Amino acid sequence: MSLKSFIARKWAAYIRKKIDQWASDPIVTQEKVFLSIIQKAKHTAFGHDHHFEEIHSYEDFVQRVPIRDYEALAPYIERVKKGEENILWPGKPLYFAKTSGTTSGAKYIPLTKESMPYHIEAARNAIMCYIAETGKADFVSGKMIFLQGSPILEKKNGIRLGRLSGISAHYVPKYLQTNRMPSWKTNCIEDWETKIDAIVEETIHENMTLISGIPPWVQMYFERLQQKSQKTVGELFPNFQLFIYGGVNYEPYRQKFEHLIGRKVDSVELYPASEGFFAYQDTQTQKGMLLLLNAGIFYEFIEADTFFSENPKRISLKDVQLGVNYVLIVSTNAGLWGYNMGDTVMFTSLKPYRIVVTGRIKHFISAFGEHVIAKEVEEALAETLAQQGGEVSEFTVAPQVNPPAGELPYHEWFIEFEQAPKDMEAFAHTLDQALQAQNSYYKDLIEGKVLQRLRITPVPKGSFAQYMKSQGKLGGQNKTQHLANDRSIADKLSEK
């Protein structure tokens, strides 16, 4: 065992103990965070507008601070962008994390001197939890790669802005600097395909032990490595031990990854976002990610089924239940208040509080009242691949509301197969049965002859990468939408 590995084990045990302390007293931990951020922001413009000086309890907060999405918060954000101070949080933010995804264009999410350290600490602690539980620490002596956006930052009215992953690249701890790849020069390449090729050249002969990134883009990296070397990733990197990922559900990609690697590797899931680092997988033995309760973020939840009603009920952590699909609402030490993340989560454990991300509140299919969510299609596909074989590179699902005359409507699955199943008919049947098992409304519609069984439309290799490229979303933090209630993606994929 190297000295670095020995120190990592000792440090991991210490970090795990600290985590267990706040996780064992979750409600008090959240109460402290809540009172702290309210007190800190009392004299901001937002605090004055919403009478923070009168807020002494969660009930007070609910009465004074409505739920907002980015568009509703934008007037305050615009003032911050113009250089005004003390708007959402004392002073000015250190950075704006620039993300895509609103009707009005890019989002500018503030990162403050109080919030930024938690982003870095959470990523580190996820690794520490893995070491503390498994005792595996040899990977810290090898090379590590973090597939991320360009670290080149712009500046606007004294505030730097860029992609969150690019901003985070400026905070890599000193003890990782010599292990970290790719080089700064390569990391600054904007074009994703050019960047991947450069990363392959830099890493192909290195001792890679930890690889991190969003699964579809790591998959592209692995495929390029295999094309160049004619070897599996596991043969190229015999000491590759840990895959760290976030952004999308890994299960639909797992078989493909294991084929590319040539063996199984341990994995750790993260739940980072520009708005905050919310959770990470703290154990290899239980489902879900530990919700980070002491990270300057106060959490609220709204049942997804009631979210679009006139006055949906907001609850704090103490009232959540297992197995209920909730919309995640956050208030943070970066100046977001009652902020609708748009993500849906479900608790898998209440001691400690662990969650899985189930999808996006706007990403669903309910053209016929079925309200199928991302988690359901992803789990149905993973189950089908396990039963029927095949490998999937990427997929999306859309409703076909207007089929040819005389036919019932159906869900159309556009799947890019790396390796097609031997029997596509059996695959489609198993997939439909798996989705019915996931969603009782869908099952009722099938049995009631409102819908016919789903159909699979295989698309050529590279179709999804081409689609993402056409949208200016190839690489980085961008993710393929796995289902939609319209056919905007489906129609693009159907174009000849």
Regions found by a protein language model. Name each.
Residues 1-53, 61-68, 75-79, 83, ...:
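Active-site glycine/GP-rich loop and adjacent strand/helix microenvironment
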Residues 81-97:
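Conserved pre-ATP/AMP-binding loop-to-beta segment of ANL
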Residues 85-86, 105-115, 235, 242:
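Non-catalytic, beta-rich accessory domains that mediate macromolecular interactions or localization
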Residues 96-110, 456:
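Conserved adenylation A10 loop of the ANL superfamily
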Residues 109-111, 156-157, 223:
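Short, solvent-exposed loop/turn and secondary-structure capping segments
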Residues 111-133:
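Conserved structural elements of the adenylate-forming
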Residues 130-174:
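Conserved AMP-binding loop of ANL adenylate-forming enzymes
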